[in-house]
Amino acid sequence: MTRGKTTPGSGTARAGTTCRGRVSFVGSGPGDPGLLTVRAAELLHEADVVVTEVPEHADLVRAVCGATEAGPELVDGGFGEDGQPLTHAARSKVVVRQAKRGLRVVRLMAGDPFLYASGPEEAQACVKAGIAFEIVPGVSSVSAVPAYAGIPLTTKDHREVAVVTCGDKVDWAQYADRRTLVLLSAVGQIGDIAAALVAAGRAPETPVAMTRVGTTTEQATVTSTLERIAVDARAARMAPPAVTVVGDVVGLRDALSWFETKPLFGWRVLVPRTKEQAGTLSQRLRGYGAVPDEVPTISVEPPRNPQQMDKAVRGLVEGRYEWIAFTSVNAVKAVREKFEEYGLDARAFSGLKIAAVGDKTAQAIAQWGLRADLVPSGEQSAAGLLEDWPEYDELLDPINRVFLPRADIATENLVAGLVDLGWECDDVTAYRTVRAAPPPAPTRDAIKTGKFDAVVFTSSSTVRNLVGIAGKPHPSTVIAVIGPATAKTAEEHGLRVDVMSPKPDVEVLVDALADFGAARRLAMVEAGQPVTRPSDRKPSARRKAGTSR
């Protein structure tokens, strides 16, 4: 974040806006970016400036607005130019100063803007300065964190709830009844609070749950009683931010815990693909509670000799081909870029049959306004495509030539199979796959020292390239592969394969990893052991290569 420093594309009122500034006090919610409200996202898109004291909000703004130079300026509301922490009054001056520049200011605040005193104080400063403002509530941690911990605040038998911001002047005697209590800022004084509640008449065995960094993949919950919560919280090293629930509703957590029990909860999973390629895979991993870390191992580059591709595209337009076969999304992208270079569009495919390997490739074709005539009914591979490919028939097929835009490292199996079926093939290098640059040093260190819980390999080349640019994953890391060929390559590099997808599909691969994680978790629970992640345990000896499926 900047400290009064303007980033490119921001810092001045956008074209088409008036010069009257406005402040939107926006709650970011309790931590999960998915809980950001629709109105909050709209305002972030429209903002000229975002003022926040929360470092993690920079990632949130980038996720909502995209990593573009035209995005809003981020102004540090936590520290001044002298490096000293800002008071509420000083932060209010920062907000007002930005609005007086005629900018649309989003004051992005953790949780809900009016849950704590800072929001109202800064809004009052806007009133005094004559600055228009609005309040956009965030999903409150009061309700969200217990919900993510599997604890309802009310039931048919417990309908009263009290929310208490803990401090030195709380009269705990007024909370001696059986109503549910939600305690904020209680971590440091939970022992004194519990003792005061017991002294006021609460039963020592009253259930208590304390949840730290709720709604995030670092969430952790300790369940205890008023009598033991101080000891148990200390043993679990609980620290702020945390929300504490006191009352019988805590007893429902065993049955209703849904977030922390996800099969890959908190797992840091290495995804050796580009962000563009990893979208679906990473999204599915997040659904199972994992934290994907995308590390490109392959860089896609244009062919060294573009003449071959130019000639093939001209031949396509002139009607030299009966079929075009796309074996990857990258192949679709390469042909589409060449079309745009020549000023062509999808009409050039008129009369041409289109084949695609894999649903994602077919979807990429569909985004072009085209529909694949042939997608393998079985295995999504060159072999699967050959099984369904028709033999050349002189009566039915006026042209016997196939255009294959592929990578420079593609195998000859598809070409040989098509020739056996009577077709002639133009096997054209549409793009090159080259080894990507090594990841940053912290990532390489995490790979080698076992800080990743799992790595997901989607091809043999990702295995070879990851080992080449970053080193071999630590023996404690779970290795998941998309199929037998990738498993063989992993084993050749001294890795033990723990999970293999039953079919060559990235979503099925993630499901298989989740099944592995669920079985691992269940085994720990049944053995009475604490549930840990693979990175929490380091074996004393390196694992030997060999497949466990």
Residue ranges and their predicted role:
Residues 1-136, 176, 242, 319-334, ...:
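Class I S-adenosyl-L-methionine
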Residues 2-19, 139, 151, 279-286, ...:
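Short, charged N-terminal beta->alpha structural module
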Residues 3, 14, 21, 110-178, ...:
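Class I SAM-dependent methyltransferase SAM-binding "motif I" and its flanking Rossmann-like core
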Residues 22, 104, 180, 207, ...:
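Residues that mark the start of a beta-strand
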Residues 27, 75-78, 105-109, 209-213, ...:
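Short beta-strands and strand-loop turn motifs
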Residues 48-51, 74, 152, 181-182, ...:
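Short, well-ordered beta-strand core segments
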Residues 57-58, 69, 135-146, 159-172, ...:
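Conserved beta-alpha
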Residues 170-210:
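Conserved anion/nucleotide-ligand pocket segment
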